[in-house]
Amino acid sequence: MNPLKKKPRTHSLQNAPEKPDWLKVKLAFPDPKNNPVAIVRNSLEEKKLNTVCESASCPNLNHCWSRKTATYMLGGDICTRRCSYCDVASGKPFPLDPEEPKRIAESSIALGLRHVVITSVNRDDLEDGGAAHFAKTVKEIRKGLPDCKIELLIPDLKVKQEALEIIFECNPDIFNHNLETVKRLFPEVAPQKRYERSLDVLKIASARGFLTKSGLILGMGETLEEVKECMQDLASVGVSLLTLGQYLQPTSTHLPVKEYVVPQVFKDLRIYGKSIGFKGVFSGPLVRSSYHADEQISWNP
């Protein structure tokens, strides 16, 4: 574990409510020599690659890896921003590894992936925010897997037009940028992000004709009405696909869970999302942005 994760957070610590049964996930790994989870893990370790699955302590890691799917994380494992809910380490990142895009492509080919999700830490230390690194990775994957769907889950890149153009030119199948939470909570939850800036990124991508996607994490203190307003904002800028999931506190020093949202509310929000124009809404307590990402394009309950 990166020692930077041990830095105390600045918010006041509170006791989270007890985790309900519907969120209790077994993380038991089978025999490491004969299971898909081990195959994915070994491939990632061999290529010295980072995944958001591990870095963000995703509860679905076992499930997704058993399906031979993973979300690659570019730019190292240290983020230049510090969000109170996120388990990715923050600090001063190392220089980009120029061979990382090639290794990600080799891993994708070895695993026979049909849908690759690529994200990154925030790299505000770079002029283009890491956009060219994304583009190079897409190019390498398409060389070896020309029919593979590629989803890019990008930071806001500070809405720099030159950086966004680099992303657009590599023509991802899905352009994903997560809003994460409602406008009121941004100062507490993601103080270095801006609500309007994230909407602008998605609006620009939608206007350019890309299939756009975003996600919200619930249970951080938002109201149901605020969630619906946020969904309306996303729909108004042309977002087609939406994911809604439950926030889970990674450690005792992170933002406490304010509420465990019951499954019925997620179902109701899915119906509401469809009613205001989203093409697909993937909503449930354990849903994450890249959970079953290959199915989300056509998912329509």
Curated annotation (Swiss-Prot):
[4Fe-4S] cluster 1 binds at residues 53, 58, 64, 290. Its cofactor is [4Fe-4S] cluster. GO terms for cellular component: cytoplasm. InterPro entries: Aldolase_TIM (IPR013785), Elp3/MiaA/NifB-like_rSAM (IPR006638), Lipoyl_synth (IPR003698), rSAM (IPR007197). Pathway: Protein modification; protein lipoylation via endogenous pathway; protein N(6)-(lipoyl)lysine from octanoyl-[acyl-carrier-protein]: step 2/2. The keyword Disulfide bond does not apply. It comes from the Bacteria. Binds 2 [4Fe-4S] clusters per subunit. One cluster is coordinated with 3 cysteines and an exchangeable S-adenosyl-L-methionine. The keyword S-adenosyl-L-methionine applies. NCBIfam families: lipA (TIGR00510), PRK05481.1 (NF004019), PRK12928.1 (NF009544). Belongs to the radical SAM superfamily. Lipoyl synthase family. This is Lipoyl synthase. It comes from Leptospira interrogans serogroup Icterohaemorrhagiae serovar copenhageni (strain Fiocruz L1-130).
